[in-house]
């Protein structure tokens, strides 16, 4: 994980990294607590754009669920979402197949 910051993306470039996973815990907590998350969303967007410019593949993860993934999916530079914990937890209640179908709908839109 790296923080969604220009500094961390530049350091990743200096280290010749080909892929980063942006930590989305802060935005996930802000969204879940119904607080303003726009500044954090902009940090993630700006970091993702710069990483893409540097040809660094961008992944995102930590605290993701349906709502947070739908919001972050608007950032086209993010190529992968790591949502394992929520998927398994939700599958206990509605089944793995249904959870996967729900996420496919979110990501395809």
What are these regions (language model features)?
Residues 1, 40, 61-62, 92:
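Glycine- and other small-residue-rich loops at beta-strand/loop junctions that grip anionic moieties
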Residues 44-62, 104-107:
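N-proximal accessory regions
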Residues 3-5, 25-27, 56-57, 61-67, ...:
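Active-site beta-loop-alpha junctions enriched in small/polar residues
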Residues 6, 41, 66, 93-97:
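Electropositive phosphate-/nucleotide-binding environments in soluble metabolic enzymes
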Residues 1-50:
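Histidine/lysine/aspartate-rich catalytic loop segments that bind and position anionic ligands
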Residues 19-31, 77-96:
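Glycine-rich phosphate-binding active-site loops on the catalytic face of alpha/beta enzymes
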Residues 32-37, 89-109:
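C-terminal helical cap(s) of enzyme catalytic domains, especially alpha/beta-barrels
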Residues 5-15, 60, 64-78:
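Catalytic cores of alpha/beta
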């Amino acid at each position: 994980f790296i923080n969604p910051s220009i500094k961390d993306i530049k350091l990743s470039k200096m280290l010749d990294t080909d892929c980063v996973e942006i930590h989305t815990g802060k935005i996930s907590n802000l969204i879940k607590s119904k607080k303003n998350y726009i500044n954090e969303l902009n940090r993630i967007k700006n970091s993702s754009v710069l990483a893409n410019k540097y040809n660094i593949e961008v992944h995102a993860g930590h605290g993701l669920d349906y709502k947070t993934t739908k919001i972050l999916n608007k950032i086209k530079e993010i190529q992968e979402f790591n949502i394992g914990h929520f998927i398994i937890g939700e599958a206990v209640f509605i089944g793995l197949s249904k959870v996967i179908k729900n996420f496919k709908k979110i990501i395809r839109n």
